[in-house]
Amino acid sequence: MKCLSCDGETFETLDYINRDFPNTGIFDELIIRICSNCGFSFLATDPTSDQIDNFYTSDYRKKGSAYHLDFGKIGRLKNLDPRAFAQLATGISFVDFKPFDAFLDLGPGNGNSFAMANLLLPNPRLYGVELNSGAIDFYHANYNANCFENLEKIISEGKLFKVILLSHSLEHIRKDDLIYFISQIRKIISEDGICIIEVPNDDFRKKELHARSNDSPHLLFFSAEALRKLFTRSGFEVIYLKVLGNPRFYNKPNFGPIEKNIVQKVKAAVLYSGILKKFLKNLRRRFLHRVSGFIEINPKGFTDNLLHQFTVDDSRDCIRMIIRSSK
């Protein structure tokens, strides 16, 4: 057995932790294999494709799940989504997105990426890949976004996209399907387009990251090194790669030049935009009484959660990468 990312042949193992889905029967007693060379990690034995399909159809979004969404009750996003905002604000630094170019989210979730695309991109045509009929109706009604069942359907219609977003979706792919999935992305990205990828920072070569509370329903785990190597050898050029996001351990915020430029613009918008002032006021009212997670309001009225999305530090909880097809 060789590592899909680097061809390494030396692996360590780690017990899989299933806190969120103990009654599904597919995430119990699993073992994670960790490539000692690059940090790419995967399950020693994958659930079958049918098991995964049934899980996402029946269990992932059901009531009581940590990932439950009732699309009949949630509404159109009225404020900012810090993660989606940061992903797209960074991505547009690397692409010339023209009016009516196409944006695709591979796993839109609550649809907030569509709201941020409408905010940051000029008249984008919005698309998603989604199976849930309630979600499909919600995206179309609130954001005029159209959905495909899968990548094969997109390829058959010959559609290309200027910006593709793969936010916290790649880790849900089966190892046996990973290389094929990446090859499909190459077929739908436009010649001058980009793909924005974000995954959890799970470099399990670092023993301190073994102290975690849950792995389910993730099937893959990435280090920044592994993510770069995986897509480089698959025919992509990596044009941006940073570890950022919420802190696992406290460190003073550190912004690179790209992130610093975006943060300065956002701060200026906060000072001069009535919409963002209202957004921050609403956040203060909602979260000031909470002391949980990493969501808090600093004395200057700027959310730490949004700043975290631009804070570069190897101990942060996410890896953000932007790629384009190699010429």
Give the residues covered by each predicted segment.
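Conserved N-terminal segment of class I S-adenosyl-L-methionine
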Residues: 1-167, 176-182, 315-319, 326
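A C-terminal cap/extension of S-adenosyl-L-methionine-dependent methyltransferases
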Residues: 17-27, 245-327
